[in-house]
Amino acid sequence: MTAPTTRKDLMIVNMGPQHPSMHGVLRLIVTLDGEDVVDCEPILGYLHRGMEKIAENRTIIQYLPYVTRWDYLATMFTEAITINGPEQLGNIQVPKRASYIRVIMLELSRIASHLLWLGPFMADIGAQTPFFYIFRERELIYDLFEAATGMRMMHNYFRIGGVAADLPYGWIDKCLDFCDYFLTGVAEYQKLITRNPIFLERVEGVGIIGRDEALNWGLSGPMLRASGIEWDLRKVDHYESYDEFDWQVQWQREGDSLARYLVRIGEMTESIKIIQQALEGIPGGPYENLEMRRFDRLKDPEWNDFEYRFISKKPSPTFELSKQELYVRVEAPKGELGIFLIGDQSVFPWRWKIRPPGFINLQILPQLVKRMKLADIMTILGSIDIIMGEVDR
């Protein structure tokens, strides 16, 4: 005869870091009472590579290939933030054509990131078909990237004062064709997913974040806009040429997983609008600020006993970062991606602080999953949209 228990037997379960629903090396220590979640503790750091410290020992040009390894599904945004800081410190003007090319690349990258969020998110909650559909469109975007930059991922395309190369012949027509095709693809997603009763049952009312709660946690991006706050840095900060295009900020009031899905689906359509306007109105002229070619040719920088010959045979062009502090930010697919940069009259940054949107958005996860079912963890985590390379840096 077994003795009666006076307390509930709680079970502690490790989810990850090898679990397919963790989208990388995230580990969750989940305390369960049957199938109800009592507590959840995220364990981070499995993909930490010291990206901030590496930046302090590299010039901006040398550091550009590293930044594409933060959020490796939206690399154009990490490149943009890396060169925007030095451009503002040095008061460097970007030609209008280069600015339009940047906007086109950023919005294509936003669509690719949202597509690769949508497929695994649907697979996590049991819908396998969209996972294969999104790769069809994503491959077309990567073909465009490959034609313009030479790389399908990790493009290393942005430069201080412009971009690395002009758009090749025929690229604009090819991109316009993609825009027309993709709008029909989004309509297909809407028909397949948005009105699906099983999908709605899994996401509606799950992981609700209130307006004040979203502000207090410092959320940004679709996480913030799905909670009733119409905040988009492309409208707020007026960077690049976004003010010259006609588009709307996508937002919802409900704050649940369905609202976050609707915001991202809407953003893909708005990105296509921006790309079409930029392609049709792209001006002529140079694709880079030719003055930046000169950089610091007159004097050799002091390397502070840094063995530069082991990095490269020829010195890379660089310039001094003036002695001031600067915070720059862009609206990345996952939220506000920011850099706090401190220069000290050296070719190396004195401090390079990364503000990753995924890391800050992830902090609210334990609060959202408490008192929910175990299966809802996948839905809520998927709706947050994290990439562990960016979270752990």
From Swiss-Prot:
Main enzyme class: translocase
Membrane topology: Peripheral membrane protein
A GO BP annotation: photosynthesis, light reaction
GO molecular function: NAD binding; oxidoreductase activity, acting on NAD(P)H, quinone or similar compound as acceptor; quinone binding
Keyword Isomerase: no
Subcellular location: Plastid, Chloroplast thylakoid membrane
PROSITE patterns: COMPLEX1_49K (PS00535)
Sorted UniProt keywords: Chloroplast, Membrane, NAD, NADP, Plastid, Plastoquinone, Quinone, Thylakoid, Translocase, Transport
E.C. number: 7.1.1.-
InterPro entries in alphabetical order: NADH_Q_OxRdtase_suD (IPR001135), NADH_UbQ_OxRdtase_49kDa_CS (IPR014029), NDH1_su_D/H (IPR022885), NiFe-Hase_large (IPR029014)
Task performed by this protein: NDH shuttles electrons from NAD(P)H:plastoquinone, via FMN and iron-sulfur (Fe-S) centers, to quinones in the photosynthetic chain and possibly in a chloroplast respiratory chain. The immediate electron acceptor for the enzyme in this species is believed to be plastoquinone. Couples the redox reaction to proton translocation, and thus conserves the redox energy in a proton gradient.
Originating species: Solanum lycopersicum (Tomato)
Subunit and interaction comment: NDH is composed of at least 16 different subunits, 5 of which are encoded in the nucleus.
PANTHER family reported in the protein's UniProt record: NADH DEHYDROGENASE [UBIQUINONE] IRON-SULFUR PROTEIN 2, MITOCHONDRIAL, NADH-UBIQUINONE OXIDOREDUCTASE 49 KDA SUBUNIT
Domain of life: Eukaryota
Keyword Disulfide bond: no
Similarity annotation: Belongs to the complex I 49 kDa subunit family.
UniProt catalytic activity: a plastoquinone + NADH + (n+1) H(+)(in) = a plastoquinol + NAD(+) + n H(+)(out); a plastoquinone + NADPH + (n+1) H(+)(in) = a plastoquinol + NADP(+) + n H(+)(out)
GO-annotated cellular components: chloroplast thylakoid membrane
Full protein name: NAD(P)H-quinone oxidoreductase subunit H, chloroplastic
Lineage: Eukaryota, Viridiplantae, Streptophyta, Embryophyta, Tracheophyta
Protein's gene: ndhH
